[in-house]
Amino acid sequence: DGLIFNTGYIDRINKRDSTDYQPMSIASPNRRFNGAATSSHMAYVGGDYQVNKNLSLRAYHAEVADLYQQNTLALLHTLQVGEGTLTSDLRSFFSDEDGSAKAGKVDNRNLSALFGYRFGGHRLSVGYMHASGDTATPYVSGTELMGMSELTMSSDFLNARERTWQAIYDYDFAAAGVPGVKSRLRYVRGDHIELAALNADDRKEREFQMELGYVIQSGPLKNVGLMARKSIYRNDFPAGAAFRDENQTRFLVLYTLPIW
């Protein structure tokens, strides 16, 4: 009771900028790995265990054949504190090369902690992520690692030896009588970055994000969401780096379709 077991096997991936299914490769911004190497398949196994209503645990093992393997552990916890709720999200990723290591050496440990406090329509969160080992944190090209840096817009903040801090402020306007409207301010800063292929170390990057979204509450367009996202990104990486100074603005249309 409370245990969910998952396993899967994937041999092709359809990226957002492609019309067909292709073999998987390893994400390699800043020439971290051999991004041209492909894998015949990925297999994973693991599960989630709901210890009680406030605590859940997660453990997974994944292998991207002949590229890398990764073990993931996570702890999610909520605690009523005063008028609000304290949330804790602890995650770890341990990665090494797999099989013939066609993408090159993989040696990374990534540990993160994100703590938030929600009261009324407000939510304040602070987090820290620490990468160690000789390489960046690996993930499949065209996807995102489900860690603390997910949904950043201009960088993945997963470089070798990177130490990342972030602060987030969310507000749900339902608390002010305007249901469906939500906003976010987010600041992410990484330092101690090592870019071996670019002969650079002790580099820094930072990203500031703003979001405003609205989900239509009724009528024929009920559950259609509109979102605007803005980011300002800066770094001191050398020429030739994949991530460069930029400002991004995105507009999204989202739709959630209830099945049951």
Question: Across the structure, where does each feature detected by a protein language model lie?
Answer:
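Residue-level signature of outer-membrane beta-barrel architecture
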Residues: D1, D48-V51, H77-V81, G116-F119, ...
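Outer-membrane beta-barrel "beta-signal"
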Residues: A167, M210-L212, D245-W260
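Gram-negative outer-membrane beta-barrel proteins
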Residues: I13-D17, K53, E63-Q69, V81-E83, ...
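Outer membrane beta-barrel transmembrane domains
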Residues: D20-A37, H41-Y49, R58-H61, T72-H77, ...
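Outer-membrane beta-barrel translocator/channel fold
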Residues: G2, N6-T38, M42, G84-A160, ...
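Transmembrane beta-strand segments that form the barrel wall of outer-membrane beta-barrel proteins
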Residues: F5-T7, D11, V45, L55-A65, ...
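C-terminal structural cap/anchor segments
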Residues: G121, S125-Q217
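Repeated loop/turn-to-beta-strand initiation elements of outer-membrane beta-barrel proteins
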Residues: G2-T7, N14, K53-R58, G82-S88, ...
